[in-house]
Amino acid sequence: MAKAAVTKRHHFMIQKLLILLSYGYTNGLDDAHSLRCNLTIKDPTSADLPWCDVKCSVDEITILHLNNINKTMTSGDPGKMANATGKCLTQPLNDLCQELRDKVSNTKVDTHKTNGYPHLQVTMIYPQSQGQTPSATWEFNISDSYFFTFYTENMSWRSANDESGVIMNKWKDDGDLVQQLKYFIPQCRQKIDEFLKQSKEKPRSTSRSPSITQLTSTSPLPPPSHSTSKKGFISVGLIFISLLFAFAFAM
């Protein structure tokens, strides 16, 4: 029992380390503005309680916040472009919440890991496309135990480990879910890109890398088709070096 607990804590530490380093990787590639949406699916114990919560932001400024009870858009940015972007995303997000709720409720997981009904945290990151094919990254975290990522640029999936891969393979075979993830950005791309361009023209506040406790989802590695800068190579190298130290510490 004690050994199993240590192993679980060790695995969780590695996952959080990967999150922190991958955050540094994506921030180091360029200074482009990006849209970030965080979705949380919780135990739907009552129809009167929020089981889905969504927040979308650009440069840490919230442009949309909704849940399954209050399905209307609220914005922290009073600009017309922010409102237009949020309104365009509202219905796709409501639809995706329902799809993800059905998906996670039908997903069989190890109850010793999830401790009850599995909760799902999803992070979508979309950098300004600059005329290129729009590509988004979808990061999935089930109960802080199963992690996998979907890249719309090349329609590829990556899991953090074999256990996560079992669940990931079932999700990737769901055509309806894949289509929703793939076309989430394209259906609002014009408004999103216009808003990101508008944001780029404004002075950008200096942001700090989040602490490990603030991070809720993981991206194991950047997609192989992405171009890699020197900062990217350094971050990837740090990931592998840190993992080597972590495994050596556990032995």
Curated annotation (Swiss-Prot):
Residues 226-251 form a propeptide. Residues 209-219 have a biased composition (Low complexity). Induction: By retinoic acid. The keyword Protease does not apply. One of its GO terms (molecular function) is natural killer cell lectin-like receptor binding. The keyword Signal applies. Glycosylated. Acts as a ligand for KLRK1. This is Retinoic acid early-inducible protein 1-epsilon. It comes from Mus musculus (Mouse).
